[in-house]
Amino acid sequence: IIFPGTLWCGNGNLANGTNQLGSWKETDSCCRTHDMCPDLIEAHGSKHGLTNAADYTRLSCECDEEFRRCLHNSGDTVSAGFVGRTYFTVLHTQCFRLDYPIVKCKVKSTILHRSKCYDFETFAPKKYQWFDVLQY
């Protein structure tokens, strides 16, 4: 499913090349960049010592954070908001990054059961871990 008015926002893309964008150009540009993230773990795939048990691809936190910023800065406020809320809030996805080991979650959203802040063991070596994405 691709969001109306876009060619890149959704599962896969409908573009006839990387330069083609839908009518919601700014939102679609954000989705295209996100789709081209170089650091990802395919559905049911493994990388960096992590296994993605989800039925969809998960990306590095760097790519997800850039996607979130891009959507927030988009002039296409309605379409960007819809895409952002769907990806970041409804899907309840996770991203991965290299960081100090998580000791515990400091703040957890009671409604969506999503971790917001973490305590880290800063004396241990960094390792790749899953992190909940922020709500949109």
Swiss-Prot record:
Superkingdom field: Eukaryota
CC annotations in GO: extracellular region
UniProt GO BP: arachidonate secretion; lipid catabolic process; phospholipid metabolic process
Cofactor note: Binds 1 Ca(2+) ion.
EC assignment: 3.1.1.4
Alphabetized PROSITE patterns for the sequence: PA2_HIS
Tissues in which the UniProt entry reports expression: Expressed by the venom gland.
Sites carrying sugar chains: N16
Name assigned to this protein: Phospholipase A2
Organism of provenance: Bombus terrestris (Buff-tailed bumblebee)
Lineage: Eukaryota, Metazoa, Ecdysozoa, Arthropoda, Hexapoda
